[in-house]
Amino acid sequence: MIYGIDVSKHQGMIDWSKVKTDFAILRAGFGRYAYQKDPQFERNYAGAKAAGIPVGAYWYSYAKSAEEAREEAKACLQVLQGKHFEFPIYFDIEDSTQENLGKAVLTAMCEAFCDTLEKAGYFAGVYASTYWFTHKLDHARLAGKYTIWLADYRAGYNKTLKRDMHQYTSKGHVAGISGRVDRNTCTRDFPGIIKKAGLNGFGKADKPLAGENSAQAASYTREIGPAARKDWTRLADKAEALGLRVNAKLTIGPMTSGDDAAIQALATELGLKCT
């Protein structure tokens, strides 16, 4: 069993260099549009990655139908693009505006979101409370198809409901985070499963070609260019999606001595080598 946290804009500016946790689940956003991305998502993702903390994500739902849940999934995918997640991407269903839609509709919404994520190459799951999984959702159906993240803060919670991750408090305290934070346990090796399957932005390792061994299969490097900025961006995004390292160098010029001085000054300001 390992221990983790889940965070959103409500935790403010997190000092990830001080955070000690086995994993972190980040709120990517909410609703049906990519512009509803959590204001702290990019910063939290970069900070956790820099600190060496494995991450997953969740999308808070306001959907009222399976079609709206699919739209939420598409928005979520836009926000996740180009990133790598060692833990699942969860559909967070708990809003009071949804609770009277009925078990069939709510369960279908979970399926619509998760199926859309899975078709795009992500390991998807559902987050809800014990109450919702018992009274609002078809837990057995969902647990048979997706990973479950269950919230229950009681000491004597129902242990018979299947789950891989358990949110056990909303009152945790962790160095680097001001105020309270949700704490979770996890009993499944998600990083191993996800990376091996090539999901969540991690491309599958290619099989060696005939006549080459596994070491040779991963020995290729390419220098590409010159390329227009839009083309370079597409290539870099593709390489990162495959889990490959991109060492970028920029060639600028020809230019005047004045322009050269301005470029050198900016490179120095950014801490970049300029030759």
PLM segments and residue spans:
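Functionally critical loop-and-helix segments that line ligand-binding/catalytic clefts
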Residues: 1-18, 139-214
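Substrate-binding cleft of extracellular glycoside hydrolase catalytic domains
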Residues: 1-123
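Structural recognition of alpha->loop->beta junctions
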Residues: 77-91, 95-97, 136-163, 269-271
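Solvent-exposed beta-strand motifs enriched in subsets of small alpha/beta binding domains
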Residues: 57-62, 206-275
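Aromatic-lined carbohydrate-recognition surfaces of secreted/lumenal glycan-active proteins
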Residues: 120-135
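Hydrophobic anchor at the start of a short beta-strand
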Residues: 55, 123-125, 148, 246
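Short beta-strand/turn micro-motifs composed of small residues
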Residues: 59, 128, 152
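Short Gly/Pro-enriched loop/turn and capping motifs at secondary-structure junctions
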Residues: 96-98, 131-134, 154-158, 170-173, ...
